[in-house]
């Protein structure tokens, strides 16, 4: 499988790092090579190991010092609770280049949310302004915006190692019918180009159902629909899920959805959608790195993150796709003789939960 060097093994010291919002949700101590504490460290700008009392920068892996030399205040769960002293510690170095985010982008995000007025308004693809990829070499930039009634994070990542789109996985299970539920009047060719650009940029392996979205730009892997229903299997589709998240797979095959925790005082990652976790830990929630150390999830599934489809509502098509490159006149895919059938209405039905 093609991917950027080092991504499959690690992003820091050979150990996995995953960024969700402004928090590092999983990282392994560079001294022990393991998870020393369930709350090893919480925030992406400074990382600490309470057992070994060291502090390092998870962005580039530079060890800053021990806790005795460089005292870092205990960070609260939410940015709104941070004090001026905390913010001073958390201020990242100024980058030479920052993405130019037009104000109209944020205005469009607030105005054209698909969940505006309490119901889904699938007009996202028509109204969002064009926003191209950020320049390579940038530190990760998080852009917070309103999505319905909640604040979510738009992810803008640099395109070069050591951090190469940590939230975009090696393997993406994609059902274009579910993508079509959020984007209206988007030609099939444009959806294909979007997937192609993601594939080129991230090196991810894109897996599509075998009987939908004929492609001419690239050859994605095809998964037989007869293996399992897409709505209940590889890519669970929950229309009621309001927070963006990622999917890991338990060793028993059950999907596990993660997202930010809504309550104060709890870990900032919540594991949902599987009774398996609650049988083991009752009401507690742990990061997959903790589950990994206890043998509850497979090692491969810890690295091969599967993109939850609501994530596409937080990464608009205009973010990943240049408007000029789209051929909006090409509404029908080119099908070679004896090729696959074009998408039918059955692929664009919403899934009931």
From Swiss-Prot:
Motif SH3-binding: chain residues: 73-80
Residue numbers spanned by region Interaction with CREBBP C-terminus: 312-319
Stretch list, region Homodimerization: 116-145, 213-248
Extent of Basic and acidic residues compositional bias: 343-353
Region (Interaction with CREB1): 2-58
Motif placement: Nuclear export signal: 188-202
GO molecular-function terms, A-Z: DNA binding; SH3 domain binding; zinc ion binding
Region annotation (Disordered) ranges: 326-353
Zn-finger (unnamed) residues: 23-49
Subcellular location: Host nucleus; Host cytoplasm
Sequence segments annotated as region (Interaction with IKBKG): 106-111
Segments of this protein annotated with the region Transactivation: 289-322
Residue positions where Phosphoserine is found in the record: 300-301, 336
PTM characteristics: Phosphorylation at Thr-48 results in the loss of NF-kappa-B activation function. Phosphorylation at Thr-215 results in loss of CREB and NF-B responsive promoters activation. Phosphorylation at Thr-184 and Ser-336 have no effect on these Tax functions. Phosphorylation of either Ser-300 or Ser-301 is necessary for localization to nuclear bodies. Thr-48, Thr-184, Thr-215 and Ser-336 are highly phosphorylated, whereas Ser-300 or Ser-301 are only rarely phosphorylated.
Protein origin, superkingdom: Viruses
Post-translational modification Phosphothreonine, affected residues: 48, 184, 215
Region (Interaction with CREBBP/P300): 81-95
Induction of its expression: Down-regulated by P30II.
Motif range (PDZ-binding): 350-353
Single biological process term from Gene Ontology: symbiont-mediated perturbation of host cell cycle G1/S transition checkpoint
The protein's assembly and partners: Homodimer. Interacts with host CREB1. Interacts with host DLG1, IKBKG, KDM4A, MAGII3 and TAX1BP1. Recruits the coactivators CREBBP, EP300 and PCAF. Interaction with human CARM1 enhances Tax transactivation and promotes methylation of histone H3. Interacts with host SUV39H1 protein, leading to abrogate Tax transactivation of HTLV-1 LTR. Interaction with human CREB coactivators, CRTC1/TORC1, CRTC2/TORC2 and CRTC3/TORC3 enhances Tax transactivation. Interacts with host UPF1; this interaction inhibits the host nonsense-mediated mRNA decay (NMD).
Note: HTLV-1 lineages are divided in four clades, A (Cosmopolitan), B (Central African group), C (Melanesian group) and D (New Central African group).
Family: Belongs to the deltaretrovirus Tax protein family.
UniProt protein name: Protein Tax-1
């Amino acid at each position: 499988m093609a991917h950027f060097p080092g991504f499959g093994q690690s992003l820091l010291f050979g150990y996995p790092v995953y960024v969700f919002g402004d928090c590092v949700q999983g990282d392994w101590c560079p001294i022990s090579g393991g998870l020393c504490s369930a709350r090893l460290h919480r925030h992406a700008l400074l990382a600490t190991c309470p057992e070994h009392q060291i502090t390092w920068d998870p962005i580039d892996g530079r060890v800053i010092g021990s806790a005795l030399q460089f005292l870092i205040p205990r960070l609260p769960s939410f940015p709104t609770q941070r004090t001026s002293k905390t913010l001073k510690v958390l201020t990242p170095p100024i980058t030479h280049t920052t993405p130019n985010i037009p104000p109209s982008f944020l205005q469009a995000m607030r105005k054209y949310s698909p969940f505006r007025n309490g119901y889904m308004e699938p007009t996202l693809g028509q109204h969002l302004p064009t926003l191209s990829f950020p320049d390579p070499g940038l530190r990760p930039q998080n852009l917070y915006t309103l999505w319905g009634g909640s604040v979510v994070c738009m992810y803008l990542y640099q395109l070069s190692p050591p951090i190469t789109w940590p939230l975009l996985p090696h393997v993406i299970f994609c059902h274009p019918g579910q993508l079509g539920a959020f984007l209206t009047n988007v030609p099939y060719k444009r959806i294909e180009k979007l997937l192609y650009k993601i594939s080129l940029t991230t090196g991810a392996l894109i897996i599509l159902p075998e009987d939908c979205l004929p492609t001419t730009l690239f050859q994605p892997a095809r998964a037989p629909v007869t293996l399992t229903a897409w709505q209940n299997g590889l890519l669970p589709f929950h229309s009621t899920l309001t927070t963006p998240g990622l999917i890991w797979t338990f060793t028993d095959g059950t999907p596990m959805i993660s997202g930010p925790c809504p309550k104060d005082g709890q870990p900032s990652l919540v594991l949902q959608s599987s009774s398996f976790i609650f049988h083991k830990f009752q009401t507690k929630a742990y990061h997959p790195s903790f589950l990994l150390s206890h043998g509850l999830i497979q090692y491969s599934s810890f690295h091969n993150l599967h993109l939850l489809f609501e994530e596409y509502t937080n990464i608009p098509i205009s973010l990943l796709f240049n408007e000029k490159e789209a051929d909006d006149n090409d509404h029908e895919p080119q099908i070679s003789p004896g090729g696959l059938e074009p998408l039918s209405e059955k692929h664009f039905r919403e899934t009931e939960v």
